[in-house]
Amino acid sequence: MSTTISTQRGQVYIGELPQDFLRITPTQQQQQVQLDAQAAQQLQYGGSLGTVGRLSITVVQAKLAKNYGMTRMDPYCRVRLGYAVYETPTAHNGAKNPRWNKVIQCTVPPGVDSFYLEIFDERAFSMDDRIAWTHVTIPEGLREGSVVDEWYSLSLSGRQGDDKEGMINLVMSYANMPAGMHMSPPVVLMPTVYQQGVGYVPIAGVPTVYNQGMVPMGMPAAPTVAPQEAPCSEEDLKALQDMFPNLDKEVIRTVIEAQQGNKDAAINSLLQMTEEL
C-alpha cells in the first residue's frame, strides 16, 4: 500500500516500486549474448558430461540467395550442438558464395539428434547480421560408419522467405568415443556479457569458453593426466601486454598458456576479445 508523507521540500509518494523500475529491457541481441554466455559456462563446468560420441562436421561452402548490404558480405557459420557453440573463420568478401572448408569436432550428448546452424555477416562497426539459419538432423546412417555429404536448405523468415535463402554444403561423419578419451581443451577467456535488467556488465573471475571451430573438452570417465602447458615467457607476456594495454595481465597469461605458447594464436584470441569489449 502506498502512503504520502510531508518533507521540507513538499509531499513525497512512498510505495512499492515496480520490478522493472530503472531497469533497461535487453534487446534480442543482448539476450542472445547472455544465452551464449550461459551455454559456454555450462560447457566449461560439465556440459559435456555423458557424451556418447564425436561428430565431425566439415562446413564446406554455401550458395546464398542475396548479398545484403552495400559491400560484399563477410559470412561465417555458427553451430550450436547441445551446450557447445562453434564458429568457423570468416570468409572475407565471400558474398553469396562463401567457402570455409572448416572441420568442427563436436561431442554429442545423449539424446541429441540435431544441431542448429546459423550464417552471420560479420560487421566492423555494428552487431553481426544473421542472414540465414537451419536445423540439421543428424543422419542415422552416420552411427553405422557412413559419411554424409549433402546440401542443406537455409530458411530465413522476413526476407526471402522460408527455405529460400540458399544452400549450405556439409560433410559429416561420426565416431564412438571410448571411455576416458580426452579431447583438446577450449580457450578459456574472461567474458563480458549482457545481464538482463542491468545492461552491459563485465563479469570478472568467471571463466567462459570461446570456440572458434575448436574441440570442446570431453569429460573422461576415469582420471587422466592433463596435457602439459607450454611455459609463458615474461618477454612474450610483456610484448602482448604492450599490444593490449586494456586487458589484465593474468588474462593475457591465461590465453598464452591455453594456446600452448603459440604467440600468433594468442594474438588472434586477444584480438577477438578486444572486439567483443
UniProtKB/Swiss-Prot annotation:
Ubiquitous. The keyword Repeat applies. Residues 35-152 form the C2 domain. One of its GO terms (biological process) is inflammatory response. SMART domains: C2, CUE. A motif (AIM1) lies at residues 133-136. Keywords: Autophagy, Cytoplasm, Immunity, Inflammatory response, Innate immunity, Repeat. Residues 232-275 form the CUE domain. GO terms for molecular function: ubiquitin binding; ubiquitin conjugating enzyme binding. GO terms for cellular component: cytoplasm. Pfam families: C2, CUE. It is found in: Cytoplasm. Coiled coil: none annotated. A motif (AIM2) lies at residues 151-154. Interacts with ATG8 family proteins (via AIM motifs), and ubiquitin (via CUE domain). Belongs to the tollip family. Both ATG8-interaction motifs (AIM1 and AIM2) are required for the association with ATG8 family proteins. Component of the signaling pathway of IL-1 and Toll-like receptors. Inhibits cell activation by microbial products. Connects the ubiquitin pathway to autophagy by functioning as a ubiquitin-ATG8 family adapter and thus mediating autophagic clearance of ubiquitin conjugates. The TOLLIP-dependent selective autophagy pathway plays an important role in clearance of cytotoxic polyQ proteins aggregates. This is Toll-interacting protein A. The gene is tollipa.
